């Protein structure tokens, strides 16, 4: 973000930064209004996704009077709330998953190597910071980025690795991987 001489903010096109092995992606900025006795007070809210591109992810939403402050606040909050998500071969999800949050629904499918990230806006940001390189995802219901991201995170948390499934079913890992398509 650059400041012109007359105080007007100019946003740079680069919405993602990489600092100390954690990639930060700005998903959504919104102007918010608080109506008070003397009139309206304007501020900004920012929705940010951070991750180490190796299975760790954090999401946060923060508000401030200025855009850079809101982004900085959200980045700090997201870094404090990192969670580990298991990845298959470090590039995709283990199995097909479905997540729901409010009216936001998401379907995600594991994809063969070289497929890439076939997903829209907020889901693509989640996949990129998480380190998922091959996935097919479809967002259903609302287009609200807050609900879509939370639905995506819920879906990712629900997935089980072959090791977890083998413990639950009391079978060997080889038997479970053998049936995988």
Model regions: which residues?
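Ribosome-associated RNA-binding proteins
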Residues: 5-181
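Hydrophobic alpha-helical membrane-insertion segments
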Residues: 1-3
């Amino acid at each position: 973000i650059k400041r012109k001489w007359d105080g007007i903010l100019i946003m740079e096109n680069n919405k993602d930064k990489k600092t100390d092995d954690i990639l930060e992606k700005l998903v959504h900025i919104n102007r918010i209004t608080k109506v008070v006795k003397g009139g309206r007070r304007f501020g900004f809210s920012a929705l940010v996704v951070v991750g180490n591109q190796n299975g760790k992810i954090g999401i946060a939403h923060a508000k401030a009077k200025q855009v850079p402050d809101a982004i900085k606040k959200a980045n700090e909050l997201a870094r404090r709330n990192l969670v580990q998500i298991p990845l298959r071969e470090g590039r995709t999800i283990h199995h097909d998953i479905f997540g729901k949050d409010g009216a936001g629904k998401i379907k995600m499918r594991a994809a063969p190597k070289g497929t890439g990230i076939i997903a829209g806006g907020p889901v693509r940001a989640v996949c990129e910071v998480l380190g998922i390189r091959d996935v097919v995802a479809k967002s259903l219901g609302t287009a609200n980025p807050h609900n879509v991201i939370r639905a995506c995170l819920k879906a990712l948390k629900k997935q089980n690795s072959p090791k977890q499934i083998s413990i639950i079913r009391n079978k060997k890992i080889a038997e479970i991987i053998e049936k995988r398509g």
